[in-house]
A protein has these predicted regions:
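Short helix-terminating capping/connector loops at secondary-structure junctions
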Residues: 164-165, 209-214
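Short, basic/hydrophobic alpha-helical segments
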Residues: 200-211
Length: 351
């Protein structure tokens, strides 16, 4: 029976091909499952609260293209975009050829608001989708089993981390990269003002001292060449941390019918984000079990990304030790660090 449970996929993984290079992930369910420690509970779905989410997009977003487009002078960035686009087209072909199910699971929706921000009744299209009633004043956050959190900035909590934190098999970072469009959005997460500021913050994280000898670091990055260069150049942060790149995953955002939410060939914005995966320099690990994985999801709220715990069980045994830096929710059995670590653990985000 234990073997059956181990072999079964979590409900959040709606599809995964045989070589595990393509995975369709339900973002809210991956975060819901991350609240649980027991693999039996995760697979069965029992005792799982539901996360309040946004309505999944049915149509691609329209974005204006620049009138006077200047060709990208960065050859490496142009090649990276072409490589990502080719991987995405292949992943979508795999899904369309072999998967006939839904592209996301039913969601628990927040109450709709009118243009003045006042709550109104759910629209007919939302009825029956598990529309959540917002709670009043926030009470105690919901803390998953065996999770540890450092609620505060990197500089404020660094001393405690150095004193108390163990070594981790996986360290996930979702840095607040400079992003003007995110800063313009209401209720958006805070971002760094510039790359110098975020580099200074990232340099404070003691990666080398707290990464297990054969551990991995997974870093969410935007598609800006300067962000990737900050990490991967000869004097970049990976070098500073004693790391070297071992793989790169792509997260593609799609509509409920499986169309990319933006034109793949758009010069302005891309429908994907990337995850750079690095190992210790000199590690015995040469590659991951599934190279250049493509994760496909219908997006949720702006700052939410799929929880990666289950996806790295291909690499580490279940129950491995993880840390998420710049976390916005907690994960059972993991450490979480950041000034928004409890953001989505507040009771009003759950039903």
């Amino acid at each position: 029976m234990a073997e059956d449970v181990k072999a079964a996929m979590p409900q959040s993984i709606l599809f995964q091909n045989e070589d595990r290079t393509v995975a369709l992930i339900d973002v809210p369910r991956s975060i819901e499952e991350a609240q649980l420690l027991s693999s039996t509970e995760i697979i069965s779905g029992v005792n799982s609260r539901r996360l309040v989410s946004s309505k999944p997009p049915d149509e691609p977003f329209r974005t204006p293209e620049p009138r006077n487009l200047i060709p990208n002078p960065d050859l490496a960035a142009a090649i990276a975009d072409l490589t990502a686009a080719a991987s995405i087209e292949q992943a979508l072909k795999v899904l369309r050829d072999t998967y006939a199910g839904p592209w996301c699971l039913p969601r628990t929706l927040a109450p709709a608001e009118d243009v003045n921000g006042r709550k109104r009744k759910a629209a007919p299209a939302e009825e029956g989708n598990g529309v959540a009633e917002r709670q009043g004043a926030a009470s105690e956050p919901l803390i998953p089993e065996d999770s540890v959190y450092l609620q505060g900035t990197i500089s404020a909590e660094r001393a405690r981390f150095l004193e108390e934190a163990p070594q981790f098999d996986l360290i996930v970072l979702d840095p607040p990269w400079p992003n003007r469009s995110a800063r313009r959005k209401k209720d958006s997460y805070s971002t760094a003002n510039n790359l110098d500021e975020i580099r200074e913050t990232l340099s404070l994280i003691p990666i080398a001292a707290h990464l297990a000898p054969e551990g991995l670091v997974a870093i969410w990055v935007t598609n800006k060449p300067s962000v990737v260069e900050l990490l991967t150049s000869a004097r970049g942060l990976l070098s500073e941390w004693g790391l070297e790149l071992i793989d790169e995953w792509t997260w593609l955002k799609v509509t409920t019918s499986g169309e990319p939410i933006l034109d793949v060939n758009s010069a302005w914005r891309k429908p994907w984000e990337r995850i750079l995966i690095a190992k210790r320099r000199g590690s015995k690990r040469t590659k991951l079990p599934s190279q250049r994985k493509v994760l496909v999801s219908v997006p949720d709220l702006h700052s939410r990304k799929p929880n990666l715990r289950a996806l790295f069980e291909d690499v580490f045994s279940p129950g491995y030790k993880g840390l998420e830096v710049f976390a916005r929710n907690l994960t059972a059995g993991w450490w979480s660090w950041g000034d928004e670590a409890l953001k989505f653990q507040q009771p009003e985000h759950w039903v």
